[in-house]
Amino acid sequence: MSNSNDAVPNPTARRQRPVIAIDGPAGAGKSTLAAHLARRFGFLNLETGAMYRAVALKAIENDLDFDEEQPLLDLAESTRIRLEPQMEGNRVLLDGVDVSRRIRDTDVTAAASRVSVHPHLRAWMVRQQRALGAKGGVVMEGRDIGTAVFPDAEVKIFLDASPEVRGDRRYRQVALPRDPDADQSEPAQLAAAQHTPDQLADQQRLLREMKERDERDRNRAQSPLRPASDAVILDSTTLTLDQVLQQAEQIVRSHLPPE
């Protein structure tokens, strides 16, 4: 994505290939699911949340007020964000610098949540995202793909889970070392989690922050977080990762024409 004045394609214009839209709250597992479906069906994987994170990171670096929309919009319009699809997600370049890891830090996550509530900034982002997916053949994940970015997407999945499960997933993602030999199914991980008092406090803090973000996302004026009327809701609260991936594949196949 760059600051271009090229015309943005109409989202309802005829595409060469389908669009798979994955929406849902923070920590639901959208990135993992999107990467899997992109590999399985030979599509590009585009993580729109990385675009908000990149703008938030640049706002942090420029000491901008996250509550002032116009300076943030001006910043976004002068920023070059490039998403390079990889096997496990996107490589994110901010003005030519790889920030793929930095944008996952907790300060950027918190800033992105505040930046994303501004309606004019979201409208600008939607135009960029439509341009990225105009030809189809993409799995695009975010919070308003099926409702605002591509309301005519051929496949729409709303991936959800309870706040407690999402909070635990996010905690383990950012705070706990990953054991490659351990059982990685969600129920096994949840049952095996033995936290120290400090870890438990950190986990509770992440849960509070996640609930606060849920509240902001669901109540913002522009493109609030909600399932599209024709989306298939996939609740992963009690499912293993393999079960989520299998059910999502079935959903995609049921909505696409036979090869």
PLM regions: where:
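Extreme N-terminal, non-catalytic leader segments
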Residues: 1-19
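N-terminal phosphate/diphosphate-binding loop that engages ATP/GTP or pyrophosphate donors
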Residues: 39-105
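The conserved Walker
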Residues: 26
